[in-house]
């Protein structure tokens, strides 16, 4: 391969660190692909005019951090593992904060820079389209009223909200031995669970693909992620059991309803099989159910309802309220909730009262259930119309119907795409989430269909048709 790195011997940063960071940057930008072979140590040292020992030092660090791997008799290759398994190069504080790993994926940076384009169509977003958000009525609140309600704010959250959450969402779960911790959305819940339950070097198993691989939380803490392949019913239970036996897995994270990013719903049979495996191996489950209020029909039993003591449950209303009002909850056995509260106190990180008051007001309304059902019907209608639009592209893009949530998952049927091929989406102003943000796969994409109303369906169709032709013709 052509050696593209250049080192500056006048910089204070050691040469091996310069080489390490440049190789990481090349991997992130798609210049080096998973499985691609790196030049031999001697050849690399000669090309860069540095000592071979400097090259060896950089490569050993990269291997320990999960970015490359050595294969007996076949040299050094870029690791096949997902982004979430790769850790930052921690040498000194100044190099930690400049580490390429802690920066967002270059594709996301490009997308953000273009997202304000007049002719762009943003289907990358993780939010419900603003025209679909229910019009909840919130009572006027004086400052005295807010200060009065603050008296009901406990270390685990606002008491009236906790009571309403149990009434609305957990009627089928025994409350004895369980408690609720109010959070600023499910991602904060994940963050606190990492702090309390895991230490650097621990491993979490999850679906492949999964939005967990797009979060920097794990790499920053030195936590490893292992993906388990899915079929239409959910993760492969045999693969899960083999992974548990092979690796010391501390937690299993699942998004069983309208999974992010694939939109799949795990079958009831598969839910029970997974619980059986996890109970056999005493493996706790984190159930992220943030899309539960966005289902089109009757929902399946949650993992939490099937195994209350085995499952830590994450819920949220942020998907209905919009991302500007972040409020969620974590339901778990009492001892874990107490540990999470202690961790929050140490860092003085409390959940704001105002979003909790708004959530309480919404759930208290007699019309809440009716509005939620109306939203579900609007989503179903928009989803069906979007699926009909996709029919024109079924020879080139594979997709499956969904039962709820925000996302469709499209997979390219032709020759395998590379990271660079996705630049055409940015050029055409169709903003989506490529699969390499969630997995090693580079030939699929996540689309948020909810902004695609009747007018935007035509725009979407035109843009996707143009992109499809360019991809088929090699751009």
Question: Where are each of the predicted segments found?
Answer:
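N-terminal basic, amphipathic alpha-helical segments
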Residues: 1-140, 345-351, 412, 423, ...
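The C-terminal cap of the DNA-recognition helix in HTH/winged-HTH DNA-binding domains
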Residues: 28, 64, 171, 245, ...
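Active-site PLP attachment segment
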Residues: 71-74, 293, 305-339
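A structural motif shared across PLP-dependent enzymes of the aminotransferase-like
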Residues: 126-143, 152-164
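Conserved core of the PLP fold type I
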Residues: 149-281, 293-294, 298-306, 462
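Structural signature of PLP-dependent enzymes
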Residues: 340-347, 363-387
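Conserved glycine-rich beta-strand-loop-beta hairpin in the small C-terminal domain of fold type I
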Residues: 376-387, 397-411
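Conserved PLP cofactor-binding pocket of PLP-dependent enzymes
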Residues: 427-448
């Amino acid at each position: 391969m052509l050696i593209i790195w250049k080192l500056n011997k006048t910089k204070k940063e050691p040469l091996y660190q310069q080489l390490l960071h440049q190789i990481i940057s090349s991997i992130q930008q798609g210049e080096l692909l998973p499985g691609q072979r790196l030049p031999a140590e001697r050849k690399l040292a000669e090309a860069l005019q540095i000592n071979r020992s400097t090259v060896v030092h950089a490569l050993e660090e990269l291997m320990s951090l999960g970015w490359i791997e050595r294969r007996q008799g076949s040299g050094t290759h870029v690791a096949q593992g997902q982004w979430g398994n790769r850790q930052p190069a921690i040498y000194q504080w100044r190099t930690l904060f400049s580490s390429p790993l802690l920066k967002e994926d270059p594709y996301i940076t490009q997308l953000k820079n273009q997202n304000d384009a007049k002719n762009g169509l943003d289907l990358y977003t993780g939010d419900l389209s603003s025209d679909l958000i229910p019009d909840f009525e919130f009572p006027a609140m004086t400052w005295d009223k807010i200060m009065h309600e603050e008296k009901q704010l406990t270390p685990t959250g606002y008491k009236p909200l906790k009571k309403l959450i149990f009434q609305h969402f957990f009627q089928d779960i025994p409350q004895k031995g369980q408690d609720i911790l109010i959070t600023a959305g499910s991602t904060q819940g994940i963050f606190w669970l990492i702090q309390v339950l895991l230490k650097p070097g621990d491993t979490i198993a999850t679906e492949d693909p999964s939005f967990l691989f797009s979060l920097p939380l794990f790499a920053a803490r030195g936590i490893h992620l292992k993906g388990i392949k899915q079929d239409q019913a959910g993760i492969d239970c045999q693969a899960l059991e083999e992974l548990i036996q092979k690796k010391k897995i501390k937690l299993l994270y699942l998004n069983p309803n309208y999974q992010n990013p694939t939109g799949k719903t795990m079958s009831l049979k598969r839910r029970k099989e997974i619980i059986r495996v996890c109970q056999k191996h005493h493996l706790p489950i984190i159930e992220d159910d943030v899309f539960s209020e966005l289902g089109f029909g009757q929902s399946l039993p949650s993992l939490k309802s099937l195994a209350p003591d085995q499952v830590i449950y994450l819920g949220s209303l942020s998907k209905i309220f919009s991302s500007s009002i972040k409020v969620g909850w974590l339901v778990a056995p009492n001892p874990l909730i107490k540990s999470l509260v202690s961790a929050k106190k140490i860092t003085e990180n409390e959940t704001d009262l105002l979003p909790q008051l708004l959530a309480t007001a919404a759930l208290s309304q007699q019309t809440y259930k009716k509005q939620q059902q109306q939203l579900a019907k609007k989503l179903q209608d928009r989803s069906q119309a979007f699926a009909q639009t996709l029919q024109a592209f079924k020879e080139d893009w594979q997709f499956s119907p969904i039962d709820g949530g925000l996302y469709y998952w499209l997979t390219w049927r032709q020759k395998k795409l590379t990271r660079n091929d996705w630049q055409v989406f940015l050029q055409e102003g169709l903003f989506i989430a490529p699969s390499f943000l969630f997995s090693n796969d580079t030939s699929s994409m996540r689309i948020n269909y909810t902004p695609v109303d009747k007018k935007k369906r035509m725009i979407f169709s035109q843009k996707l048709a143009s992109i499809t032709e360019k991809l088929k013709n090699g751009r």
